[in-house]
Amino acid sequence: QRQMCIRDRQSALLEAMQERQVTIGNETFGLPKPFLVLATQNPIEQEGTYPLPEAQVDRFMLKVVIDYPKLEEEKLIIRQNINGDKFEVKPILKADEIIEARKVVRQVYLDEKIEKYIVDIVFATRYPEKYDLKELKDMIGFGGSPRASINLALAARSYAFIKRRGYVIPEDVRAVAPVSYTHLTLPTNRE
C-alpha cells in the first residue's frame, strides 16, 4: 500500500516536471508559467527516505549541496527562531520577468566548439575509456543522459547571462558542471 502511494506521487511529480501538467481523476490541468521544482534530498539512510527513480533524477537540472551553516549563521538562526521573529520574504521578480529572462538566456550564443566540449564531458561519463579515463569505468553505473548535455548547456548559458555576457566560454561550462550533471551520472554502488 505504502509503496503504491509513493509510486503514485512520483508518477504525478514526473508528469508535472515533464509535461507541465497534473491529472486529477480524468481531468488534466496545465501548470502556470513559470513552473519550476525545488526539492530537498535527505540522506538515503534516513528512515522514510526512498531513492528517486533514474527517470525522476534525470529531470532535475541542478543539484546544489548546501553545507551546514557557519557558527555565526547558526547563532542567528537560533536567535530568530527562539525570539519568534517573523521571516519576511519579499519578491524580487515578477513571473513575466522570469519568463523574459529565460527567453534571453536561450539567446546567449553557444558556439559549436563549446557544444562539442559539453558533449565530450557527458560522453566521457558514458565511455570513460575513450577519453583515457579507464579508472572511472567501474565507478560509473550510468553515464549522463542526453538531458545532462542539455542541462549543462542551459546552465552554462545562464551563467554567462549572470556574468553579463552574450556568449558562453569554457569557464562557464566548468563553473556549472559540478552542479548541473554530476547527479545524473549514477555510481555503480547506488542503492
Task: Give each language-model segment a name.
Residues 1-8, 182-191:
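Conserved small/polar residues in nucleotide/adenosyl-binding loops
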Residues 6-7, 32, 53, 111:
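GHKL-family ATP-binding catalytic core of two-component histidine kinases
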Residues 9-23:
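P-loop NTPase nucleotide-binding module
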Residues 19-93, 99-106, 157-159:
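Canonical AAA+ ATPase core
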